[in-house]
C-alpha cells in the first residue's frame, strides 16, 4: 500500500519544476547580490554628497578628499537623451522593416533580410564604435551638422558649433542604428503573429493595402511600444561605441552638437583613475546604481507591454 502511495505521489511531482527551481533561485540571488554590491559601494558617496550627487553637474577630482566634488547630472541626462534620440530613429526604421519583410519582400529576399538583421543585432559594440568614430562622425559633421549650423543656428538645438562632430547627435544616431535590429525583431515577430483572419477581413471589406497595413500597425501597438522601450533600455547601457563618438565632456545641455557623457562612458573612462581618489570609485558605483535602477524599471515596463500583447493575441 505504501509503495502504491509513493508511486502516486511521484506521478504528481513535476520533475522539470524541481530541476528549474534551483536555477531560478540562483538567478534571484545573483540579482540581489549585484544590487547590494552596487548599493553598499555607492553608500559612501551618497552619504557625503546626498541628493546633490544626482542633480548637480560637477566633476572635481582632488588629492585631498575634502576638495573632491562630484555631480552626475550630465551623465544621467546624456544617457536618457541619447537613448531617446536612438528610439526616435529606431521607431520608423523598425516598423518599415517589419512591414516590408512580412508583406512586400519576395521569398528569396525575406530570409536574407532576417539573417542580416539578426547578425547586426549580435555584432560586438566595438565594431559599431570604430565605424561610428571614423566614418559616421565625419560624415555627419561635414554634411549635416555644418549645414544645420550655418542655416538653422537660430534654432537652439543647432546653435552649438560642430567643431569635432563627437556629440550627443552622433551618439544618438549610432545607438539608433545599433538598437534598430533589436526593436525590429520584436515588431517583426508581432506583425507575423497577427491572425490571418484580420487581414482577410480587411481585404474583404475593400480596404487598400495601405489601409490594411495602417489597421494592423494599430493592432500591434503594444508590441511596438514594448520593442521600443526594451530598445531604450538597451541603448542606456551601451558603453564602448558611445564612448568613441559622444565626446566625453560634462555638458548638461540639449544642444545636439555639444559633446557629452553617458553613465556608461563615464564609468569606462574614469574607472581606471578612480583608485587614486577617495570618493571617485564610490561615485562611479553610484552612477552604476542609477543605471541599474533605470534599466530595471525600463525593462519591467517593456516586458509588461510585451506580455499584454501576447495575452491579447492568445485571446
Curated annotation (Swiss-Prot):
Keyword vocabulary terms for this entry: Cell membrane, Membrane, Phosphate transport, Transmembrane, Transmembrane helix, Transport
NCBIfam families with a match to the protein in the record: phosphate_pstC
GO cellular component: plasma membrane
GO molecular function: phosphate transmembrane transporter activity
Protein name: Probable phosphate transport system permease protein PstC
Family: Belongs to the binding-protein-dependent transport system permease family. CysTW subfamily.
Annotated membrane topology: Multi-pass membrane protein
InterPro entries hit by this protein: MetI-like, MetI-like_sf, Phosphate_PstC, Phosphate_Transport_Permease
Gene Ontology biological-process annotations: phosphate ion transmembrane transport
The organism of origin for this protein: Methanocaldococcus jannaschii (strain ATCC 43067 / DSM 2661 / JAL-1 / JCM 10045 / NBRC 100440)
Principal location: membrane
Function, in words: Part of the binding-protein-dependent transport system for phosphate; probably responsible for the translocation of the substrate across the membrane.
SUPFAM superfamilies: MetI-like (SSF161098)
Residues passing through the membrane, by range: 18-38, 80-100, 119-139, 167-187, 227-247, 283-303
Gene3D superfamilies in alphabetical order: MetI-like
Localization terms from the record: Cell membrane
Amino acid at each position: 500500500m505504501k509503495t502504491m502511495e509513493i508511486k502516486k505521489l511521484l506521478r504528481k511531482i513535476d520533475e522539470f519544476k524541481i530541476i528549474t527551481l534551483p536555477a531560478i533561485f540562483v538567478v534571484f540571488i545573483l540579482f540581489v547580490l549585484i544590487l547590494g554590491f552596487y548599493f553598499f559601494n555607492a553608500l559612501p558617496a551618497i552619504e557625503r554628497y546626498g541628493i546633490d550627487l544626482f542633480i548637480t553637474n560637477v566633476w572635481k577630482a582632488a588629492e585631498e578628499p575634502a576638495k573632491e566634488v562630484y555631480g552626475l547630472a550630465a551623465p544621467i541626462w546624456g544617457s536618457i537623451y541619447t537613448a531617446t534620440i536612438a528610439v526616435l530613429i529606431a521607431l520608423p526604421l523598425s516598423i518599415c522593416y517589419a512591414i516590408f519583410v512580412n508583406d512586400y519582400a519576395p521569398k528569396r529576399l525575406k530570409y536574407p533580410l532576417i539573417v542580416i538583421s539578426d547578425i547586426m543585432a549580435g555584432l560586438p559594440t566595438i565594431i559599431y564604435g570604430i565605424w561610428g568614430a571614423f566614418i559616421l562622425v565625419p560624415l555627419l559633421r561635414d554634411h549635416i551638422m555644418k549645414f544645420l549650423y550655418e542655416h538653422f543656428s537660430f534654432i537652439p538645438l543647432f546653435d552649438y558649433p560642430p567643431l569635432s562632430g563627437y556629440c550627443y547627435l552622433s551618439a544618438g544616431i549610432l545607438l539608433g542604428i545599433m538598437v534598430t535590429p533589436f526593436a525590429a525583431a520584436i515588431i517583426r515577430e508581432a506583425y507575423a503573429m497577427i491572425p490571418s483572419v484580420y487581414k482577410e477581413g480587411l481585404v474583404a471589406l475593400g480596404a487598400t493595402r495601405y489601409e490594411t497595413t495602417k489597421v494592423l500597425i494599430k493592432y500591434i501597438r503594444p508590441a511596438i511600444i514594448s520593442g521600443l522601450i526594451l530598445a531604450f533600455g538597451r541603448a542606456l547601457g551601451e558603453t564602448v561605441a558611445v564612448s568613441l563618438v559622444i565626446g566625453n565632456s560634462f555638458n548638461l545641455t540639449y544642444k545636439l552638437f555639444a559633446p557629452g557623457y553617458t553613465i556608461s562612458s563615464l564609468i569606462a573612462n574614469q574607472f581606471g583613475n578612480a583608485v587614486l581618489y577617495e570618493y571617485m570609485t564610490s561615485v562611479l558605483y553610484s552612477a552604476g546604481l542609477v543605471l541599474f535602477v533605470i534599466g530595471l524599471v525600463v525593462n519591467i515596463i517593456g516586458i509588461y507591454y510585451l506580455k499584454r500583447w501576447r495575452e491579447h493575441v492568445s485571446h
